[in-house]
């Protein structure tokens, strides 16, 4: 179950369509009400849909409320605010997994200093290991056509930093497959995939075969309750 805790984001990534919805954050009492409603159906929740969850000023209280009602929490973040929020995340027993969308660095036109961006994330991950938090690094920026030389170089720079951090004796590209993750350390994974395309009623009709998990084994509740 996905629960959007804010519709606001601090980046403007090329792969993420802008929202026309009003800026909003989820109040604690609204989360508690939602958790009571979904409790018979799941014990795992994802505190994100659109927006950057670490912009929520009381994300620590949301985690505490989730734990009080017996839920395990996964969070997906662009990672830019991890230093500011580390004290709100570490030591929270509800927090099961954090996914870092590393492709957001190159997806946002104004990004600067890749080394510091990744360094802050890796510094957090080192401490998160002591709390048995699962970490997933995501690079969902592969193109189905020929990848540009610039995109290849940018990805290689990111992967080199990860290879050095975890003392890997291989290049990650040699083992990773689109849509499948690889384990690079205890509780630490890397997932590389094609760029995610957000569904749109304005997009060209796709006659290909596919399968949608929505409302079968997953659902999302937006910050306004819809």
Question: At which residue positions do the language-model features occur?
Answer:
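A structural signal for short, well-ordered beta-strand segments and their strand-loop junctions
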Residues: 74-76, 99, 134-139, 171, ...
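Conserved strand-turn element in the central/C-terminal portion of the radical SAM core barrel
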Residues: 73, 105-107, 124-155
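Accessory C-terminal segments flanking Radical SAM cores
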Residues: 2, 178-226
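Structural recognition of alpha->loop->beta junctions
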Residues: 39, 86-107, 150-182
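A structural motif corresponding to the C-terminal lobe/cap of the Radical SAM core domain
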Residues: 120-130, 208-212
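Surface-exposed cleft-lining segments at the edges of enzyme active sites
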Residues: 105-112, 199-204
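Class I S-adenosyl-L-methionine
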Residues: 54, 140, 165, 169-171, ...
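Conserved alpha-helical substructure of the radical SAM core
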Residues: 1-98, 108-119
């Amino acid at each position: 179950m996905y629960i959007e805790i804010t519709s606001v984001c601090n980046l403007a990534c090329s792969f993420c369509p802008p929202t026309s919805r009003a800026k909003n954050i989820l109040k604690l009492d609204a989360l508690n009400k939602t958790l009571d409603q979904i409790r018979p159906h799941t014990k795992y929740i994802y505190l994100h849909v659109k927006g950057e969850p670490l912009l929520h000023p009381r994300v620590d209280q949301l985690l505490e409320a989730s734990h009080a009602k017996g839920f395990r929490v996964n969070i997906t973040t662009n990672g830019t605010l991890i230093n500011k929020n580390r004290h709100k995340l570490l030591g929270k027993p509800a927090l099961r997994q954090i996914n870092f969308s590393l492709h957001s660095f190159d997806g946002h036109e104004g990004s600067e200093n890749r080394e510091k961006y990744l360094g802050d994330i890796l510094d957090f991950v080192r401490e998160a290991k002591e709390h048995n938090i699962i970490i997933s690094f995501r690079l969902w920026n592969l193109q189905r056509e020929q990848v540009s030389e610039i995109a290849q170089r940018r990805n290689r720079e990111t992967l080199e930093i990860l290879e050095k951090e975890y003392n890997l004796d291989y290049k990650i590209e040699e083992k990773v497959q689109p849509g499948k993750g690889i384990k690079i350390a205890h509780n630490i994974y890397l997932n590389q995939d094609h760029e995610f395309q957000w569904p749109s009623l304005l997009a060209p009709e796709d006659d290909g075969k596919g399968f949608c998990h929505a409302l079968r084994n997953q659902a999302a509740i937006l910050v306004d309750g819809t």
